[in-house]
Structures are given as structure tokens and as C-alpha cells.
Amino acid sequence: MVREKVKVSTRTLQWKCVESRRDSKRLYYGRFILSPLMKGQADTIGIAMRRALLGEMEGTCITRAKSENIPHDYSNIVGIQESVHEILMNLQEIVLRSNLYGTCNALICVQGPGYITARDIILPPSVEIMDNTQHIATLTEPIDLCIGLQIERNRGYSLKMPNPFEDGSYPIDALFMPVQNANHSIHSYGTGNENQEILFLEIWTNGNLTPKEALHEASRNLINLFIPFLHVEEETFYLENNEDKVTLPLFPFHNRLVKLRKKKKELVFQYIFIDQLELPPRIYNCLKKSNIHTLLDLLNNSQEDLIKIEHFHIEDVKKILDILEKNRKFISN
């Protein structure tokens, strides 16, 4: 456990982790402060952060399981102590950590007798189990058991459908939220017009993210929500998708690309690969799958084109804009 004394700054707004501990493999705790704040600001930030921590965070869960010769999820299998329903409930409790984008498959294939734990799950390299000791099932006889799993990264929760899927797999209720609880409290100090506040944030996570990682991600999510308000109305366009309209800023580097074409210098972009831009793995993989390999490929796509890429979101476009802004040397005249 890490604990620090709280020192109040009288100048620049600062944040600090004042307590950090791991109570178990599936329970992390962090306590943070932000100060100095003017009266009322601590509550504004605290409420927004708590909602973002509990509702906007992405997590990774097992969402489907499939095995041969299972008539229904309340049946029992000879040689297995638990019912199918109990096995599905145990799989629901497995805590995973990943940089996965979308879904992937995993596998359990064991021979009894013996105990099956999370350690027996064969995972892709992008997924990690936080607690290998989590119990799944007990084989009481020398039988072979193979279970195919689907792993998904998402946010919020997903309630299983009452019936199995057409391929015979069984849905599993998924709670994607890595933050188990979040609280904020306020300490006021000073007098009269000089009254100021310290915001205390407490975060509990399941190990999918550490509290500090959760704080950073929630902050980024909040910033992304407010970005559209930083652009004047005339410099935006509307993307219509199934009756939903989304406002996005214009791609600021298109004009620069047009100027370079006039100077016949755009060919240099063919030799700047997106690998050099240090993109997040998920964005990088989506671009690669869409045959976007170079900076020229990227700049030749409008934001409308990018948003149509499978598994691509508005936040990803904004992240690309931020990265391009930081790499102006690649796009200079």
C-alpha cells in the first residue's frame, strides 16, 4: 500500500495519488486529490468523473460459451460436478485485461479428473487473465471437456438472450465495467472570498484497469465529449447514420495536402508509414485492415470515410487529429 501526506498547492491546479493498494487480484483501490479549486468546482468535477468512471469505461468479458452435446444451459453433464448454468456463471466472473478491439476467441480443452480454473483458458496474446485461480468446473471422471469461448471488449453491460445462438453457443451476461465503485468528497479551506476546495476521488477497480488508468481514461472520455464545443459551427459537418446525427470537426490537414499536390511534393507522404505515428494499437489495426498503410493513404480519406471503417468511432478520428497535430513536421509545407 502506498500512502502520501496531502499537501495543498496555492498556485497551479494539480492532482496527486495519495493512496494506492491492491486488496486482492480482483480488487484495486486508489485515492486521488485535485486542488486548489474554486468554490463549487470540486462538486462539478466530482459528479462528472464519477459518472464517467461508472458508465463510460470499457472492459473485457467472456460473452459466449460453446460445447458439444449440451441440450440446455440448466442441464448436467456426466462427469462434471457443476451444472452448465453454474459453469456459465463461473465464466462470467473471470476478469480479463486486454487492448482488444471487438471480439476474439479462446478455448478450454482439458481431461479429467481434476479442477478447471482460469489458468486452463487458452487465450490470444492480446488478452490477459487477472486471477488464474478463479474456479470454472470440477471434472470427477476421466472425460474430455472442450469449451469454445468468445471474448469481447465493450462498455456498460450486456444481458444474455433467453435462448442459445444458432451455432449452439450460450450467451453469458457481461458486465464490462472495470470500475466497481467511485466516490468523491470535498474539503473546503480558507475564509470569505478566498474560500477554496480540495476534491478527493476514491476509485475501486476489478484489476481490468488500475485506479490510475481508470482516472486517465475517464478524463480522456470527458474531454472527447466536450471537443465538439471547441469548434465553431461553420467549421463542422454532419454525419448521418441511421437517423442519428453526429458533429465532427473538419480534417485540418486536407488543405495542406492540396497545396503540396500543387507543388508535386505529396509523394513524400507515400514513404511515411502510419507505424511512425505511434497510433494506439486498436486504431492502427483498423487502419491496416482498411489498407491504410501510409500517411498519404490516411490523408486521402475524409472523416466520413474513416468513420465508416468497421469498429471505428468518433473518438478514434479525434485521436488521429491529435496525433497529426503533434506530428506537424510530417505535414509541413
UniProtKB/Swiss-Prot annotation:
Region (Alpha C-terminal domain (alpha-CTD)): 267-333
SUPFAM superfamilies: C-terminal domain of RNA polymerase alpha subunit (SSF47789), Insert subdomain of RNA polymerase alpha subunit (SSF56553), RBP11-like subunits of RNA polymerase (SSF55257)
Catalyzed reactions per annotation: RNA(n) + a ribonucleoside 5'-triphosphate = RNA(n+1) + diphosphate
Subcellular location: Plastid, Chloroplast
Highest taxon listed in the record's lineage: Eukaryota
Keyword Chloroplast: yes
Record keywords, A-Z: Chloroplast, DNA-directed RNA polymerase, Nucleotidyltransferase, Plastid, Transcription, Transferase
Gene3D superfamilies registered for this protein in UniProt: 5' to 3' exonuclease, C-terminal subdomain, DNA-directed RNA polymerase, insert domain, RNA polymerase, RBP11-like subunit
Gene Ontology BP term (one): DNA-templated transcription
Pfam families listed in its UniProt record: RNA_pol_A_bac (PF01000), RNA_pol_A_CTD (PF03118), RNA_pol_L (PF01193)
Keyword Transferase applies: yes
Matches recorded under InterPro entries: DNA-dir_RNA_pol_insert (IPR011262), DNA-dir_RNA_pol_RpoA/D/Rpb3 (IPR011263), DNA-dir_RpoA (IPR011773), RBP11-like (IPR036603), RNAP_asu_C (IPR011260), RNApol_insert_sf (IPR036643)
Region span, Alpha N-terminal domain (alpha-NTD): 1-233
Top EC class of this enzyme: transferase
Listed EC numbers: 2.7.7.6
Biological function: DNA-dependent RNA polymerase catalyzes the transcription of DNA into RNA using the four ribonucleoside triphosphates as substrates.
Subunit structure and binding partners: In plastids the minimal PEP RNA polymerase catalytic core is composed of four subunits: alpha, beta, beta', and beta''. When a (nuclear-encoded) sigma factor is associated with the core the holoenzyme is formed, which can initiate transcription.
Domain notes: The N-terminal domain is essential for RNAP assembly and basal transcription, whereas the C-terminal domain is involved in interaction with transcriptional regulators and with upstream promoter elements.
Family the UniProt entry places it in: Belongs to the RNA polymerase alpha chain family.
Identification of the protein by name: DNA-directed RNA polymerase subunit alpha
Organism: Aethionema grandiflorum
